[in-house]
């Protein structure tokens, strides 16, 4: 926002001292092999609200913005409240299954109450995908809901001509070769096994394929065509440059994710002109438009289906180049922070009384 000449007063982090009162609760639930989210307790939500209210009183504030619904749940500051996030609690609870199975029934009920209360309290709630917005629409007036996709977190210095040139170069020098890139930290949920099997099938079909894996450690024996690179942090210049080099050198981004609320990594793939091949699940379809900047396969689709779609791209230079160009266009038009933040600023401005 500051980059777009908006005055921003930051209150972060919020004090969490009140959480110490709930140490016995954490201990008991852990002993029962369950968990509880302390941020959903009203007393903690009220403590957050008091901090924000005091901050607002001492400054000239037009709009309160939060990237989470939690701090604004019980906020009463007399100002418009805007939030921007990637999902609502009840959708995540239903969608992610195992990840929420350890929560107590009371904890789940509090989570749903917190989200619904926050949505009633805010002026506008923006979400990173249509899937997330649909979940929120079950809790509040849909007129206050907006879709704003998340952008790429990697710097982009190239232009459309560079993308066209690189795509043509890749297909002219790698006629029966394919460099796949997989980026994800949860091997099972991100579909690592499907990615490995896809690469195996492509090799069996006569397409010399290498799969580079970032983030996750593959389960089981690592085949010779798989290169496991471990976790690479974007927080360091060295790590950021390594990721840039990997995206730039890859042909296709593959992520057979079983559950995904949003897709920053798909925005990053598009920013380098990489077609993505993934499942049409959760918020993914807002980042990978089937037939535009990649292919979205129906959930449960086999590795053979992934291999088939990738083989089509590899064996048709014109089709690959078209995907690559459209991917970069999607990044320039939608999947970048500048565009989404500019829309967010307009949304915030519209909430301010004249």
Question: What do these predicted ranges mean?
Answer:
Residues 312, 319-334, 343:
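A short, well-ordered alpha-helix in the C-terminal region of glycosyltransferases
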Residues 275-278, 288:
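Short hydrophobic beta-strand element within catalytic cores of glycosyltransferases
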Residues 215-252:
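Nucleotide-activated donor-binding/catalytic signature segment of Leloir-type glycosyltransferases, i.e.
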Residues 104-108, 113-167:
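Donor nucleotide-sugar binding/catalytic pocket of nucleotide-sugar-dependent glycosyltransferases
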Residues 32, 78, 82-116:
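Acceptor-binding helix/loop patch of EC 2.4 sugar-transfer enzymes
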Residues 126, 164-190, 196-201, 211:
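Conserved donor-binding/catalytic core segment of Leloir-type glycosyltransferases
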Residues 258:
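Aromatic "clamp/platform" in nucleotide-sugar-dependent glycosyltransferases that forms part
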């Amino acid at each position: 926002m500051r980059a777009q000449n908006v005055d921003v007063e930051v209150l972060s982090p919020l004090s969490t001292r009140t959480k110490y009162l709930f140490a016995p609760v954490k201990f008991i639930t852990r002993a029962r092999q369950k968990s509880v989210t302390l941020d959903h307790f009203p007393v903690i939500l009220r403590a957050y609200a008091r901090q924000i209210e005091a901050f607002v009183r001492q400054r000239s504030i037009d709009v309160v913005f939060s990237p989470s619904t939690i701090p604004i749940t019980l906020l009463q500051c007399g100002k418009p409240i805007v939030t921007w996030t990637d999902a609502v609690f009840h959708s995540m609870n239903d969608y992610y299954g195992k990840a929420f199975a350890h929560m107590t029934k009371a904890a789940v009920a509090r989570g749903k109450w917190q989200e619904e209360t926050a949505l009633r309290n805010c002026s506008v709630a923006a979400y990173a995908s249509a899937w997330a917005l649909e979940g929120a629409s079950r809790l509040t007036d849909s007129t206050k809901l907006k879709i704003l996709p998340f952008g790429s977190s990697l710097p982009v210095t190239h232009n459309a001509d560079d993308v066209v040139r690189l795509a043509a170069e890749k297909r002219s020098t790698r006629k029966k070769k394919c460099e796949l890139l997989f980026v994800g930290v949860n091997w099972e949920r991100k579909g690592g096994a499907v990615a490995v099997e896809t690469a195996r099938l492509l090799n069996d079909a006569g397409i010399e394929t290498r799969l580079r894996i970032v983030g996750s450690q593959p389960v089981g024996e690592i085949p010779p065509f798989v290169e496991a690179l471990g976790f690479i942090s974007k927080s360091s210049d060295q790590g950021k440059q390594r990721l840039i080099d990997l995206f730039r050198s890859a042909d296709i981004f593959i992520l057979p994710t079983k559950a995904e609320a949003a897709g920053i990594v798909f925005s990053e793939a598009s920013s380098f002109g990489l077609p993505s091949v993934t499942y049409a699940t959760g918020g993914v379809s807002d980042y990978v438009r089937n037939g535009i900047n990649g292919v979205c396969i129906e959930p449960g689709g086999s590795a053979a289906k992934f291999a088939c779609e990738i083989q089509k791209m590899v064996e048709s230079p014109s089709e690959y180049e078209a995907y690559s160009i459209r991917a970069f266009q999607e990044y320039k038009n939608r999947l970048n922070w500048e565009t989404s933040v500019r829309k967010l600023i307009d949304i915030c401005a519209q909430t301010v009384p004249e």
